[in-house]
A protein has these predicted regions:
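Extracytoplasmic copper-binding redox domains, predominantly the cupredoxin/blue-copper superfamily
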Residues: 373-524
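Bacterial N-terminal signal peptides that target proteins for export
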Residues: 1-11
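Short amphipathic alpha-helical segments with coiled-coil-like heptad repeat character
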Residues: 4, 260-264, 445, 518-521
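Beta-strand-centric surfaces of beta-sandwich/beta-rich domains
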Residues: 31-248, 253-372
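C-terminal region of N-terminal signal peptides and the immediate post-cleavage residues
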Residues: 18-35
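Bacterial N-terminal signal peptides
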Residues: 9-21
């Protein structure tokens, strides 16, 4: 599939590419063995939740839809919105959804330490409906329910793919769906559900927040509960939704980033508040919550909750805070909801089945390989002082002084006098290559992965140095309350200064976007 210029106003404003879907949707191919994803490992630890793969709904056919090919440039960390062309050619019902990302050259899922699917959100008529992070949770409607599909719908894809390497690559984003044509006998009696998007940051293109090391209580930080100013200046509390019709909730899942422990869905009525479901992050790696080697628990097929108009639904998320700080993280819980009431447990008088299951086993591409000895990086604690400097320039994915990958004088830690600060300047393409200066524990010189380095050193972080567009969402997305928000992770600046109150010593840092980049400076 090739990409053409997106004719809609948002795309024109952002300068993004798109594959335009004409009024007639393209025929999507049925899934063949050659196109099927690699088998998933089901090797789980003894304490893991059970894996429960939902059977395909009667009459459903599995189709693999692809978007691309997309060229992911070296160091890329951008958000784009594209129109989707490859879709079912007839009206019908979607009963299952399995996301993925594959390389063009070999149809294999790339290791997360090389190409990272930060997020992909499939929007139907501007409403977030299906989504994926690196954990790639499978989504299946409970028996008898489905998402309605028509060829008249506008389907868009909001996606963000990190290239953690200095070399380009090409990928497809994939969406494997179970689809029942509207005229099939099995389509009779299907009950329509839609997706209610619950996010601790509300509806934003980049809905993130930061978790500081040591924040919260007993090594855990609950957002927004532990952030009194979480929504300061916002017109409403972003993590809440007032239910606008009597309905039945029929499923939900959670999404967190490394460091995340769970998400919680809550319901309030008449001064009472109950928990509807906790989506737990199960980390397959024994190292725990420091990587994308994770699966999120989902509700069981029998989970049904009756809600009433005027109820208040909300979402919270919990992160650990002993291992490190966690920057630009998320807490999201999409919820399947009916258009009319269809039974279910009243959570204030009955018992909701809150037991969760995993939708799949361990994903080979998410197994982390970082944290091993790396002879290509120096130990800055053993190096002599470099020169006194007042600035460090970042260019070609390297620091001009104190870069641990350099063996020359330029590899020695830059020196700054106590009470002064160092200025970091990003001289890589400021609209496409963003860098951070994030403190890590010295010597911070092992191989890069997702679980290494961590933000476990001095508590400083520059944000992503670079520039990106902003957009008025209020007129584009239903229920958005943002007038002007950034579309990318860029901090809207290319410079940052170290804190002036750092004590004497050697400080190591890395780039969160490109973790192979390491540097050091000394305060004397």
């Amino acid at each position: 599939m090739t990409a053409r210029r997106c004719p809609i106003a948002l795309a024109a404003a952002l300068g993004i590419s798109a594959a335009f879907a004409a009024t007639a949707a393209a025929q999507a191919p049925a899934l063949s063995s050659a196109m099927a994803p690699a088998p998933l490992s089901a090797r789980l630890s003894a304490d893991a939740p059970p894996v429960q793969v939902a059977p395909r709904a009667p009459g459903a056919k599995t189709m693999l839809l692809k978007y691309g090919p997309m060229t992911i440039k070296p160091g890329q960390n951008l958000i784009a919105v594209d129109l989707l062309k490859e879709r079912p050619a007839v009206d019908g019902w979607i009963t299952g959804f399995r996301p993925g990302m594959i390389r063009v050259k070999d149809a294999a899922s790339p290791p997360v330490s090389q190409l990272h699917l930060h997020h992909a959100v499939w929007l139907v008529d501007w409403v977030p409906t299906f989504a994926s992070g690196e954990e790639k949770t499978w989504i299946d409607a409970s028996p008898g329910y489905a998402w309605k599909y028509t060829t008249r719908q506008h389907w868009l894809l909001n996606h963000m793919i990190h290239n953690l390497t200095p070399t380009p690559d090409q990928v497809y984003l994939t969406m494997e769906i179970d689809f029942i044509p509207a005229d099939a006998p099995e389509a009779q009696g299907i009950k329509e559900i839609t997706t209610r998007w619950m996010d601790v940051q509300g509806l934003k293109p980049y809905p993130v927040f930061d978790v500081k090391r040591g924040a919260g209580k007993n090594g855990k930080y609950v957002y927004p509960d532990d952030a009194p100013d979480a929504y300061k200046g916002a017109p409403r509390v972003r993590n809440r939704w007032v239910v606008d019709h009597d309905a039945t909730l029929v499923g939900t899942i959670g999404h967190v980033h490394p460091g995340g422990l769970n998400t919680d869905l809550w319901l309030e009525r008449g001064g009472k508040k109950v928990n509807l479901f906790r989506s737990d992050a199960h980390y397959f790696d024994p190292a725990g919550p420091i990587s994308w080697d994770v699966g999120m628990t989902v509700t069981r097929p029998e989970w049904k909750v009756a809600v009433k108009k005027g109820d208040v639904m909300s979402v919270t998320t919990t992160y650990e805070t002993r291992r490190g700080a966690w920057y630009e993280v998320m807490g999201i819980m999409p919820v399947g909801i009916t258009k009319t009431p269809d039974g279910g447990v009243d959570p204030f008088t009955g018992q909701v089945d809150r037991r969760g299951v995993l939708s799949h086993g361990r994903l080979p591409e998410n197994i982390d390989s970082g944290g091993k000895p790396n002879p290509g990086l120096s130990n800055p604690l053993r190096l002599r002082d470099g020169p006194y400097v007042d600035r460090i320039v970042i260019k070609n994915f390297a620091f001009d002084q104190g870069d641990l990958s350099r063996s020359s004088r330029a590899g020695r830690p830059a020196v700054v006098a106590r009470g002064k600060s160092l200025l970091f300047v990003n001289r890589d393409p400021e609209l496409t290559v963003f860098h951070t200066i994030t403190g890590c524990k010295a010597p911070c010189n092992k191989t890069a992965g997702i679980g290494f380095p961590l933000a476990d050193g001095a508590p400083f972080d520059s944000g992503e140095l670079g520039y990106g567009p902003v957009v008025n969402l209020d007129s584009l997305i239903k229920d958005s309350d943002d007038e002007r928000v950034p579309i990318t992770a860029a901090a809207q600046r290319t410079t940052w200064r170290t804190p002036k109150n750092l004590n004497r010593g050697t400080y190591t840092y890395f780039c969160r976007v490109h973790p192979f980049m390491r540097g050091a400076f000394r305060v004397k």
